[in-house]
Regions:
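A beta-strand edge to alpha-helix "cap/lid" segment located at domain peripheries
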Residues: 2-10, 64-136
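A solvent-exposed, acidic/Ser-Thr-rich amphipathic alpha-helical stretch
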Residues: 32-35, 39-87
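Short charge-dense sequence patches
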Residues: 13-24, 45, 58-64, 119
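Short, low-complexity N-terminal intrinsically disordered segments enriched in polar/charged residues
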Residues: 1-40, 135-136
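Broad hydrophobic/π-residue packing in well-ordered secondary structure
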Residues: 22-26, 34, 38, 44, ...
């Protein structure tokens, strides 16, 4: 399964944005391939808002902790969809949704990444909430 996209702005270029490529790999057959886009000195924070099945939580760390987060995840039956994306220098922002395969929205996410000189993610912060939805 691959990530969807809508209304992407990438400073006038037609290539995929960083987050389109990252989520496509993360949602694909081998989620660990997404680590190809991650710098060795990564720092990250993933924040999940509470829903009916879990309390609010935050996951932090480096590249190996992100690998562990990927290992613990269940990626079957859903994917990331980038709705809007902007780039400012070496920083990219993406607003998107996670959706079940049938198209039903699971939650909304806001992600930001600082990219190194090789285009790999060096800093990453993402927050996800099931409460708010934005127009695509």
């Amino acid at each position: 399964m691959t990530s969807g996209q809508a209304d992407i702005v990438s400073q006038g270029t037609s290539h995929k944005t960083f987050f389109e490529r990252y989520f496509e790999l993360l949602d694909g057959q081998d989620p660990h391939r997404s680590l190809e886009l991650v710098a060795d000195d990564l720092e990250f924070s993933i924040q999940w808002a509470a829903d009916g099945s879990r309390k609010s939580s935050q996951f932090v760390g480096g590249r190996e902790e992100l690998r562990g987060f990927i290992d613990a995840g269940d990626t079957d039956g859903w994917a990331h969809y980038v709705l809007h994306s902007r780039v400012s220098g070496n920083v990219e922002f993406a607003l998107g949704e996670t959706r079940w395969d049938n198209g039903e929205r699971i939650g909304t996410f806001l992600a930001v990444a600082e990219l190194d000189e090789s285009g790999r993610m060096r800093r990453y912060m993402v927050a996800r909430s099931p409460v708010l939805a934005f127009p695509g």
